[in-house]
C-alpha cells in the first residue's frame, strides 16, 4: 500500500513536533510488538516446559540423542537437586576453565592476527562475565580478542549460559508440575534448550540482521578515508551478526564493539533497534506467559504479564520523560531532549525503552551512553537492576519472579488468615527460607562491595564525576554484576584488578548461589502432592494479588537500597533541577 503524500507529511510533522506524545506512542508500539511475538512463542515454550516434543524435534531429536550418547546421559536418567546442581556447576566450571586458557594463549591459536590479548584479571572477569550470562565488558577494543576467541569462547559461552539458565527454569517448573521427587536431567534439559529454542531463534535473527545491513565476515577491518582528512581509518569488522543474534536471543548483552548497540554496525537503524528489543524480551516474556498454559491457569499467566508490563510502562515513561525534559539547570535539552550519548537515528524514546528493557531483562545491552543520561533517566533504568531483573534472562526470569511470588503468597496468606499454597502445593518453612535467602542475597552482593569500595581512597582518583555521581556509578556497577545484567554506566576506570576480580566474584555468587537456592525450592516442591483446593488459599491470579506482588517487589527490592539511592541518583537529580533540597545540600 502506498500512502498519500499528505498523510506521510502529516505523520512526519506530528512525530517531529509532538515529541512527548510521539515518544509515548513509540514506547507502547515497542511493548505491543514484543507482547504479540512473546504470546505466539509462549505456546512453543509451554511444550518444552511440559516435556512434549515440539515441531522441530523431528530435526533436532537425532542431534540431541547423538550428544547424549557421547556424554553417556539420557532423559530417562532423572536427577534430584544435588546431582542436577553439581552437574550444572561442573559443566560450567570446565567450560569456563577452557575458555580462560583459550583467551590467555590465543596468540598461539589460529586467526589470532591483530589480537592484543588480556591481562589475567581481565581474562578472569571476561570469562566469568560471559559464563554467568552477565557480559559485563571491562574492555572496549574488539582487537583484544582474536576471531577464534570471539567465535568459540565468547559466542560459545553466550549459548552455554543461556542454555544453562533455561535448563534451570525447566527443572523448576518440573518441580512444581510433578511429584516424583526428581527435577530432570541437566544435560537433556540443556540440549533441548539449545537445539529446540535458542539456536533456531538465533539463526533466524542472524539472517534478518544480515539483510538489515549488519556485517557478517571474516575480514578483520575495512579501511576508509574520511572526506575531511587524508588519513586512513581502519574500522573493525567480523562475525558481528552472529554474535549480535545470540547476544539478544540469549539475553547476554555483550557487544562486538565497545559502544555495543550504539555502534552503527551492530545497530544500523530504527528497525534493527526494534528487532533487538524484541529479540531480548521474547523468550523471558514468552516464558512467563507460558506458565499460564503449563499450569492450566491462563489467569495466572495474564497476571504475570500485567505485573511485568507495569514495570515496563513505569520505568520506560520515567526514563523517557527524564531524558525528554533534559537538565533545565544546565540548559540541556530544551528542544531536543537529552541527546547526549544517543544515536540521532534512534532518538530519546527508543533509547529509553531499549535501556529499560535491557535492565528489566538480564540483557544489559545498550544503544547509548548511560553515563550521559540525566539522573531521572538513570533512575528509570536502574530500577530493573535493583529488583534483580524481574523479567530476567533466558530461564532465570521464571526463577526470579517465583521467589517474589512465594514470598508474596506467604505474606498475603498471613494477612488474611489462609494457608500459604502455590499451585495447590503447601509452602513450607524450607520454601520460605530459601526464597528469602534468594531475595536478601542480591542486595548484600551490591551494598557490601559498594561500602568497601568507598572506603578505599586511591580508587577515587579514577572517577571523573562528583561524589553523588560516584555513588550512582558504583551502585550501577555492582547491581549490574549481582543481577547478571552486564550493562555498564561507566564514569570510572573499571579495567583494573580490583574491579575485575571483585565483579567476577559478585557475578559468580549472583548466578550460582541464587540458582542453587531456587533449585532447592524446586526439589522441595517435587516431593509434594497437589491438594484439592477448598478456598483455603489466596487467589494468585487476580488483580489484588498482582497489586500485592508489585508492592512486595518494590518494598523488598527498592527499600534495601533507599539510603544509597538518596545519596546517589536522587541527590544528583535535586542538584540538576535546582530544588531547595539540592541548594541546601
Swiss-Prot record:
Top-level taxonomy: Archaea, Methanobacteriati, Thermoplasmatota, Thermoplasmata, Thermoplasmatales
Subunit-level organization: The system is composed of three essential subunits: KdpA, KdpB and KdpC.
Protein name: Potassium-transporting ATPase potassium-binding subunit
Principal location listed in the UniProt entry: membrane
Family from the record: Belongs to the KdpA family.
Transmembrane segments: 25-45, 84-104, 152-172, 194-214, 275-295, 307-327, 345-365, 368-388, 397-417, 437-457, 502-522, 547-567
InterPro entries linked to this entry: KdpA
Gene Ontology molecular-function annotations: P-type potassium transmembrane transporter activity; potassium ion binding
Cell compartment(s), UniProt: Cell membrane
Cellular component GO terms held in the UniProt record: plasma membrane
Purpose: Part of the high-affinity ATP-driven potassium transport (or Kdp) system, which catalyzes the hydrolysis of ATP coupled with the electrogenic transport of potassium into the cytoplasm. This subunit binds the extracellular potassium ions and delivers the ions to the membrane domain of KdpB through an intramembrane tunnel.
Record membrane topology: Multi-pass membrane protein
Domain of life: Archaea
UniProt keyword list: Cell membrane, Ion transport, Membrane, Potassium, Potassium transport, Transmembrane, Transmembrane helix, Transport
Species of the source: Thermoplasma volcanium (strain ATCC 51530 / DSM 4299 / JCM 9571 / NBRC 15438 / GSS1)
Amino acid at each position: 500500500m502506498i500512502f498519500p503524500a499528505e498523510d506521510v507529511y502529516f505523520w512526519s510533522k506530528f512525530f517531529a513536533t509532538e515529541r512527548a506524545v510521539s515518544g509515548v506512542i513509540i514506547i507502547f508500539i515497542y511493548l505491543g510488538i514484543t507482547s504479540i511475538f512473546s504470546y505466539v512463542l509462549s505456546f512453543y515454550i509451554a511444550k518444552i516446559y511440559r516435556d512434549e516434543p515440539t515441531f522441530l524435534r523431528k530435526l533436532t531429536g537425532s542431534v540431541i540423542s547423538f550428544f547424549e550418547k557421547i556424554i553417556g546421559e539420557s532423559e530417562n536418567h532423572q536427577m534430584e537437586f544435588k546431582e542436577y546442581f553439581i552437574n550444572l556447576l561442573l559443566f560450567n566450571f570446565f567450560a569456563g576453565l577452557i575458555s580462560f586458557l583459550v583467551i590467555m594463549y590465543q596468540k598461539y591459536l589460529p586467526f589470532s592476527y591483530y589480537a592484543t590479548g588480556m591481562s589475567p584479571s581481565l581474562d578472569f572477569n571476561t570469562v566469568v562475565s560471559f559464563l554467568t550470562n552477565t557480559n559485563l565488558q571491562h574492555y572496549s577494543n574488539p582487537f583484544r580478542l582474536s576471531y577464534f576467541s570471539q567465535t568459540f569462547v565468547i559466542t560459545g559461552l553466550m549459548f552455554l549460559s543461556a542454555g544453562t539458565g533455561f535448563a534451570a527454569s525447566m527443572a523448576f517448573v518440573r518441580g512444581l508440575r510433578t511429584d516424583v521427587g526428581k527435577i530432570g536431567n541437566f544435560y537433556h534439559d540443556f540440549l533441548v534448550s539449545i537445539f529446540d529454542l535458542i539456536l533456531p531463534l538465533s539463526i533466524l535473527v542472524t539472517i534478518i540482521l544480515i539483510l538489515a545491513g549488519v556485517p557478517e565476515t571474516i575480514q578483520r577491518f575495512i579501511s576508509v578515508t574520511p572526506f575531511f582528512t587524508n588519513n586512513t581509518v581502519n574500522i573493525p569488522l567480523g562475525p558481528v551478526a552472529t554474535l549480535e543474534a545470540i547476544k539478544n536471543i540469549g539475553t547476554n548483552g555483550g557487544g562486538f564493539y565497545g559502544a555495543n548497540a550504539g555502534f552503527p554496525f551492530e545497530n544500523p537503524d530504527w528497525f534493527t533497534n526494534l528487532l533487538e528489543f524484541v529479540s531480548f524480551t521474547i523468550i523471558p516474556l514468552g516464558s512467563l506467559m507460558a506458565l499460564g498454559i503449563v499450569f492450566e491457569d491462563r489467569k495466572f499467566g495474564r497476571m504475570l504479564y500485567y505485573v511485568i508490563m507495569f514495570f515496563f510502562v513505569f520505568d520506560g515513561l520515567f526514563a523517557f520523560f527524564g531524558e525528554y525534559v533534559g537538565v533545565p539547570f544546565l540548559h540541556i535539552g530544551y528542544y531536543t531532549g537529552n541527546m547526549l550519548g544517543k544515536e540521532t537515528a534512534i532518538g530519546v524514546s527508543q533509547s529509553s525503552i531499549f535501556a529499560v528493557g535491557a535492565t528489566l531483562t538480564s540483557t544489559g545491552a545498550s544503544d547509548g551512553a548511560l553515563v550521559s543520561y540525566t539522573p531521572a533517566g538513570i533512575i528509570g533504568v536502574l530500577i530493573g537492576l535493583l529488583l534483580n531483573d524481574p523479567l530476567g534472562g533466558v530461564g532465570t526470569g521464571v526463577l526470579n519472579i517465583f521467589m517474589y511470588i512465594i514470598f508474596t503468597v506467604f505474606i498475603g496468606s498471613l494477612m488474611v488468615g489462609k494457608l500459604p499454597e502455590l499451585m495447590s502445593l503447601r509452602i513450607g518453612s524450607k520454601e520460605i527460607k530459601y526464597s528469602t535467602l534468594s531475595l536478601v542475597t542480591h542486595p548484600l552482593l551490591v551494598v557490601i562491595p559498594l561500602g568497601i569500595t568507598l572506603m578505599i581512597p586511591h580508587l577515587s582518583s579514577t572517577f571523573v564525576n562528583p561524589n553523588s555521581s560516584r555513588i550512582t556509578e558504583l551502585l550501577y556497577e555492582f547491581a549490574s554484576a549481582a543481577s547478571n545484567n552486564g550493562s555498564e554506566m561507566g564514569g570510572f576506570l573499571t579495567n583494573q584488578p580490583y574491579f575485575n576480580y571483585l565483579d567476577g566474584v559478585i557475578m559468580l555468587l549472583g548466578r550460582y548461589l541464587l540458582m542453587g537456592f531456587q533449585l532447592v525450592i524446586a526439589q522441595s516442591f517435587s516431593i509434594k502432592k497437589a491438594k484439592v483446593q477448598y478456598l483455603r488459599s489466596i487467589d494468585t491470579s487476580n488483580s489484588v494479588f498482582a497489586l500485592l506482588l508489585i508492592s512486595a517487589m518494590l518494598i523488598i527490592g527498592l527499600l534495601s537500597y533507599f539510603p544509597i539511592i538518596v545519596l546517589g541518583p536522587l541527590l544528583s537529580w535535586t542538584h540538576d533541577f535546582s530544588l531547595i533540597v539540592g541548594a541546601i545540600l
